[in-house]
């Protein structure tokens, strides 16, 4: 699917890889201008389409997901060149997986948030998009729940 989308959109300098995102790849250190970390999540943002999610959720699973997300962010952060971009996204509305991960990441890595406004429709512009992140909510934004943050490496 990713390869199809790269071809469909005319991507010429895009490389999709199948690998374990929790395992460090030294050949990728500071090699990418942009890294997209679309991490595994609880899926609470798509619960309308997958109602079984609410029956499988537990506090322990939530903690495990957050730890997995942070392991992936740790590796992804190392692959971005100085002044490069890291995009972090989930399909959840859980604060622990979204805003709290952003705060954790900023505290532990040499990155800053960067405005999303130039990249999203004007009707989605708000205080948080100027800061560098956006939480889409079902019923408000006419979409599934989704979170995205844009980081710039210092």
Residue ranges and their predicted role:
Residues 1-154:
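S-adenosylmethionine
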């Amino acid at each position: 699917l990713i390869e199809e989308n790269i071809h469909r959109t005319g991507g010429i300098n895009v490389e999709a890889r199948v690998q374990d995102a929790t395992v460090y790849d030294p050949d990728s250190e500071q090699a990418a201008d942009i890294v997209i970390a679309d991490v595994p999540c609880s899926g609470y943002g798509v619960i309308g389409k997958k109602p079984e999610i609410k029956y499988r959720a537990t506090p322990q699973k939530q903690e495990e997901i957050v730890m997995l997300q942070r392991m992936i962010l740790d590796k992804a952060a190392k692959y971005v060149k100085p002044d490069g971009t890291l995009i972090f996204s989930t399909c959840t509305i859980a604060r622990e997986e979204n805003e709290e991960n952003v705060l954790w990441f900023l505290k532990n890595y040499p990155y800053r948030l960067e405005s999303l406004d130039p990249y999203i429709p004007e009707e989605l512009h708000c205080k948080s998009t100027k800061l560098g992140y956006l939480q889409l909510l079902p019923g408000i934004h006419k979409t599934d729940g989704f979170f995205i943050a844009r980081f710039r490496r210092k």
